[in-house]
């Protein structure tokens, strides 16, 4: 059994890792463990260095503590500060751009066992992979609206990056009592990781990279 530590932003990601990713990877003889960062990002506060000095320090420490194991992240790309390493990339293809940014951050952190990963554009984006699952938490009109949003983009990872139209903002507007942790996990379980991977190529690449560790020496 190989261990992978996923440095993440909060309880929503922690629940997803424990309830969805852990059983999936366990079958590949990989155990994933969430580590919640202590630096909270908010809309009104941006930290120096984009991926802040504190995040970099915590992630570096984690990598050194587990130097023979793999460390990755589960951070929202949405609302990252402008001075995040690599964020000045002008590549129009979001999937190429995000890989460049992740590689730039990896170079900045400079730990061989670290692979930075962003959720495009945030965790809630992957929930648009299967709009029919929203019948569990919303009425038929809302489900139809979510279908319309999903159908308007090439992938759920393209649902865009503004305070009004980010995936979580859309869900909060459509479902006033939306509970991020509880509903996010419920919806993810219903749609299943295979559907999410099919619809979200950047997420799929991350999962496949972790899976590849199971066959590595």
Which residues fall in each region the model found?
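Long alpha-helical, hydrophobic tracts
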Residues: 10-12
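Short hydrophobic beta-strand that contains or immediately precedes a catalytic carboxylate
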Residues: 6-8
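C-terminal accessory helical subdomains adjacent to catalytic cores in phosphodiester-
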Residues: 14-41, 56-217
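Extreme N-terminal starter segment of soluble prokaryotic enzymes
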Residues: 1-4
